[in-house]
Structures are given as structure tokens and as C-alpha cells.
Amino acid sequence: MEKELPAVSYKQFMKFKPCWADDEQGLRRLQYYRRKLGGKANALDILRLRRVSVEDRLWSVLREEFIPAAILHEFACRCAERALELVPNPDPRSVEAIEAKRQWLRGEITGDELAAAWAAALDAAWDAAWAAASRNQVNMLINLLKEEGYA
């Protein structure tokens, strides 16, 4: 049996205050899609609007009015996993935080345990950023000293 996503009316959508509705062209575009979609749209309707930027489509639907909270959380986990695929050796705390989120979604851990995993992942991100910045600063200083004639 196919599930049905909630639909949002044009009036409800305007309460989200889309920034592109601030100019005449953006407002015309919204009114065009209101007519095209019959005054209501669900997340899939909006995600399939190819002439709307990816950023605007995601901004529009990544909210509980369009998508159930559990799916939004799972989507966040998948985005985080995709980002970690770009890192040669991701910090285990980041990987564990994603798993903790899924455990929380299944009711296997408490909100406090999830918060602890999130804090550990945040520490990992800061550690990585600090290390990268420090390496960059060392290289910058070496290059500056070389530019100034110091071998």
C-alpha cells in the first residue's frame, strides 16, 4: 500500500516566508506553480519541479509540514554519511553519532545519550578543523618566511 505525504496549500507555504517571494519574478513563479499544482503540493511534487533550483526545492520541503520527522532524521543521517565518504579516515565519533541517531529513532537510546554522541561528534569536527587550520597556518608561515628570503 502506497503511503501519502501531507500536502501544503499555497497559503501555508507562504507562511514559511520564502525569500524568493520578496521580488516580483519570484512571486510570479510561485503563483505559476500554485496553478500548475492545483493550489496544494506535497514534497514529491516540489522535488520534481526541475525549473526550481535544487536549493529552493530542498529549502521548501525539509520541514515536518511536508515530510514526517523520522524521515527527516534519516535523511540527515544519510547526508552525514555521504559527507563522511569524502573524508579519507573519518573520526569514529562522527560515525558513532550517526548510528546513535538511528538508535534514538528506533527508541533504543535516550535523548541524553543522543546528545552525548552529538557532543562527541562536534568535538571531533572541531578537532579536525583545528588540526587543518593549524597545518595550514604552519605552511602559511613557512611560505611567508621563504618569501621574505629566509631559507
Please give the residue ranges for each predicted region.
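Short, glycine-biased loop/turn motifs at secondary-structure junctions and
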Residues: 1-151
